[in-house]
Structure formats: structure tokens, C-alpha cells
Regions:
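PLP-dependent enzyme catalytic core of the Aspartate aminotransferase-like
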Residues: 96-101, 106, 110-142
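Residue-level recognition of strand-loop junctions within catalytic nucleotide-signaling folds
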Residues: 9, 38, 84-85, 122-124
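Residues that form or flank phosphate/diphosphate-binding pockets in enzymes
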Residues: 24, 41, 89, 114, ...
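Conserved PLP-binding catalytic core of the aspartate aminotransferase-like
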Residues: 50-51, 55, 64-101, 117, ...
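PLP-dependent aminotransferase class I/II
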Residues: 1-64, 70-72
Length: 142
């Protein structure tokens, strides 16, 4: 389940409403979101795990730095990876590799960031799988 929310000036909300997906959050999803906000223990655990796994994935990207990758510092539940503009290791190539291996990330070419991938922080298994797949891509492309 994925829940999102925004607090903004009315013109910004109107702009967001024009580009959002066609389906709003279900009533069940809304109830689950409200209940999760009341569970401080769970929120703290998720926050700690997200910070820990983000640091792990950033470290894995740093270890691949000799291939020209750079993790953009983040305080979010994702990291932004910048790839070289050209050469054997690119964002487009990594995106295709990850998709071919069942991993969906966000290739940001449409947002005018063709050298970048946005990768969400998931579970420990998911995060380690992404790190291993990126390492395999870089090692195979070099």
C-alpha cells in the first residue's frame, strides 16, 4: 500500500491534481494510513530502518564510484544516483538492466535528468538485491 499527502498553496494543489493518477486512495487505505500514524513504535522502527538501509545503499554506490556513480545526499526514503553522461555505465543502461532483473526504479530522463535514477528504500532484502544488481551491472559493463 502506498499513501501520499501534500500541504501546499491552493494553486500548487490544483496543479498536482491535474497531473496525479486517476485513482484516489481507497477508504481502507485511508483508514490504514491514519492507524499507522498512531503507532509511534512502528513509525520509529520504519524511520530507523529507512535511515539505516539508505546509508547502506549510499555506501554501496560510493563503492562503485570508480565507475562514475554518485549518490546524491538525501533525507528521504529514496536515493538519487547520478551516472556518467556517456561510456559503458549509464543511467539508461542501469535502468534497463534493473528492469530486466525484475527491479523497478525511476529513470528520470522525462524530468530532464537523463543521468539519474531514483531508487526507493525498501526492505533489507529488496535493498540488498538492488545493491547487488547495480554492482553486477557495473562490473558487467566495465
Amino acid at each position: 500500500m502506498r499513501i501520499g499527502w501534500a500541504v501546499a498553496a491552493l494553486p500548487i494543489i490544483a496543479a498536482l491534481d491535474r497531473v496525479r493518477g486517476p485513482f484516489n486512495v481507497t477508504t481502507t487505505g485511508q483508514a490504514a494510513a491514519v492507524a499507522s500514524l498512531a503507532d509511534d513504535t512502528h513509525l520509529d522502527m520504519v524511520r530507523r530502518e529507512t535511515i539505516r538501509l539508505r546509508a547502506f545503499l549510499e555506501g554501496e554506490i560510493v563503492a562503485l564510484g570508480n565507475a562514475g556513480l554518485r549518490a546524491i545526499p538525501s533525507a528521504c526514503n529514496f536515493i538519487l544516483i547520478e551516472f556518467p553522461e556517456s561510456g559503458p555505465v549509464t543511467a539508461a543502461g542501469a535502468n534497463k538492466w534493473l528492469l530486466d532483473h525484475g527491479i523497478i526504479c525511476r529513470y528520470l530522463a522525462v524530468q530532464n535528468m537523463p543521468r539519474c535514477l531514483r531508487i526507493s528504500i525498501g526492505t533489507e532484502t529488496e535493498t540488498r538485491t538492488v545493491a547487488a544488481a547495480l554492482r553486477d551491472y557495473v562490473e558487467g559493463a566495465a
